[in-house]
C-alpha cells in the first residue's frame, strides 16, 4: 500500500543530513509533506521545492504544523499516512533504518497506530522530558485502556482516521493525546508499537551525523541543569493532558 509522509520541521542544522538521507525517504514514501515555519531559511526552502513528490507547507502560526501537514497529506494519493516530527525521523532513519522500514510495513495494517518509544529510547531523553512524559503516558494509558507512550511524535493513519482528526480539530494544540482519543471515540481501533529509533533527537542539532549515546547523555545533562526547561516541560505536560481530557469528555477540540 502507498504511504505518504507528513512531518513538521523547524530546521536546526539538519540540512547536510537531510541531503544525505532524502533519497531513502523518497524510496519508501509515495509523497512527502513537510510543514515548516515562516522563519525557515532560503537553502532549506529551495531544497524542498526542488525535490520530486515533495510538498512544503509554510505555517502562518506556531503550533499549526502538525494539523496542516496532515491536511496536505490527505490531498496526496496514498492509502495511509505516516506522521512523524521530522527531526525525529531523520534520527530514526540514520540510526536504525531497518526498524524504520519494518515500522512502515506495519502502518497499513492498522487504522491508527501510536508509534511510541521503548524504555531504552525514552531514557535517552533528558529527565525533565522523561519524567513529565511518564505522567502524560499514565493518563493516556488509562484513557485508552492499554499501555502507551504518546510522546514519540509519530503516528500511522488510515485515511478515515486522518479525516476524523481533521474534522474534529482545528490548527493549534499538541494532538499527542487528543488525536488517539478522538479516533478511539469514533469507533476505530487504536494500536500501539514501541520502537528504539525514536530516541532523543535534539542532541543531533547542528551535527554532521546523529549524536552518539555519549553525546546524547552529555547534552541531556546540560539540558536538565536549566530549571526553566523543567518548568516548560511541566507546562507542556499539563497542556497535553488537558487537551486529551477535553477530547475525552467532548469539550473543546482545539486547545491552546
Role assignments for model-derived ranges:
Residues 109-151:
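Short, flexible, basic/aromatic active-site loop/helix in glycosyltransferases
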Residues 89-122:
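Conserved donor-nucleotide/metal-binding helix-loop-beta segment in metal-dependent transferases, i.e.
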Residues 49-64:
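Conserved donor nucleotide-binding strand/loop of the catalytic core
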Residues 136-137, 150-166:
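Conserved nucleotide-sugar donor-binding
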Residues 7-28, 39-42:
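Short, well-formed alpha-helical segments that are part of the catalytic scaffolds
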Residues 173, 177-180, 184-256:
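C-terminal catalytic/acceptor-binding lobe
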Residues 67-80:
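Active-site nucleotide-sugar/metal-binding loop of Leloir-type enzymes
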Residues 78-91:
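Short beta-strand-to-loop acidic/aromatic patch adjacent to the donor-nucleotide binding site
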Amino acid at each position: 500500500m502507498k504511504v505518504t509522509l507528513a512531518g513538521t520541521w523547524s530546521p536546526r542544522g539538519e540540512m547536510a543530513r537531510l541531503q544525505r538521507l532524502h533519497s531513502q525517504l523518497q524510496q519508501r514514501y509515495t509523497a512527502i509533506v513537510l510543514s515548516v515555519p515562516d522563519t525557515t531559511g532560503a537553502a532549506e526552502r529551495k531544497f524542498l521545492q526542488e525535490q520530486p513528490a515533495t510538498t512544503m507547507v509554510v505555517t502562518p502560526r506556531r503550533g499549526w504544523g502538525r494539523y496542516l501537514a496532515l491536511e496536505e497529506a490527505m490531498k496526496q494519493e496514498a492509502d495511509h499516512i505516516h506522521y512523524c516530527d521530522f527531526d525525529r525521523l531523520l534520527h530514526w532513519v540514520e540510526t536504525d533504518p531497518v526498524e524504520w522500514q519494518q515500522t512502515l510495513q506495519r502502518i497499513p495494517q492498522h487504522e491508527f497506530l501510536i508509534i511510541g518509544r521503548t524504555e531504552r529510547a525514552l531514557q535517552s531523553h533528558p529527565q525533565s522530558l522523561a519524567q513529565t512524559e511518564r505522567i502524560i503516558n499514565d493518563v493516556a494509558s488509562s484513557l485508552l485502556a492499554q499501555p502507551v507512550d504518546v510522546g514519540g511524535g509519530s503516528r500511522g493513519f488510515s485515511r478515515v482516521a486522518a479525516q476524523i482528526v481533521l474534522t474534529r480539530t482545528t490548527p493549534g494544540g499538541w494532538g499527542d493525546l487528543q488525536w488517539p482519543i478522538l479516533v478511539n471515540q469514533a469507533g476505530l481501533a487504536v494500536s500501539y508499537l514501541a520502537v528504539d529509533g525514536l530516541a532523543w533527537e535534539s542532541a543531533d542539532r547542528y551535527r554532521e551525523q546523529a549524536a552518539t549515546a555519549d553525546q546524547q547523555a552529555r547534552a541531556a545533562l546540560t539540558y536538565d541543569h536549566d530549571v526553566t526547561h523543567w518548568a516548560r516541560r511541566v507546562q507542556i505536560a499539563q497542556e497535553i493532558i488537558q487537551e486529551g481530557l477535553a477530547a475525552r469528555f467532548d469539550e473543546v477540540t482545539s486547545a491552546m
